[in-house]
Amino acid sequence: MTFDKGSLILVDYTAKVKDDGEVFDTTIEADAKKHSLHEENVKYHPKLVSIGETSYPVLKGFDEALAKTSVGDKLTVEVTPDKGFGERDSKKVRMIPIRKLGEDAEKVSVGDTIEVDNKRGTIRYIGSGRVQIDYNHRYAGKTILFDVNVLKSLDSSNDKVGAILKERLPVEDTKIAFDLKDKEVSVTVPEEILRADGLQIMKHFIQLDIFKFVKTLEKISFVETHINKQAPANKPEAKEKTPEQKTV
């Protein structure tokens, strides 16, 4: 059984460059640690993919291969540059005076990613007072291999809502809670992100995605509970002491 356009699926994968075997992306924490990619603030969990859709996209070649798979499949997908990160374009490689980097001039080295003129590029050469910056994608011109495990097809409304929240909310999965009843869903906003920058944007995209992929829903509510942490704690009232009786 293959997947139709718009299907939501969960996959685990590890991606590497075919030529030299460089591993640069993974959903699996053990692989991230093994290849020195691990980051403490990154959530390692199966990736949510929307087949043929832009909501939760992957590289075109990867998407096309996933559409032909079934749950339980384990395979290696080869993605060529034309359906991956694109071909290299020599026009995107520029040589600039190193002084243009300002205070960063003495801090950068070959291989660093830097932003110049509002564009991000990779430093390829430093010398003679000049810096060569490559504005191609770091893996442009490279064939990519994905070792992938197709874990689950999200078919129920409950599974779809849960997966969307896990993908969109920057908290541990155990802190995500929602209540789905008939044509309504109530989403509890975790306390730790109540004051987070971009919360309204998160909520905006969550409701867009849920309405898009769970077409039976008519209403989404976001529940925010604010606790007054400055309120004085209630202390038990002290009992009135009885006068001590003295014996003569």
Cite the ranges covered by each PLM segment.
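FKBP-type peptidyl-prolyl cis-trans isomerases
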Residues: 1-248
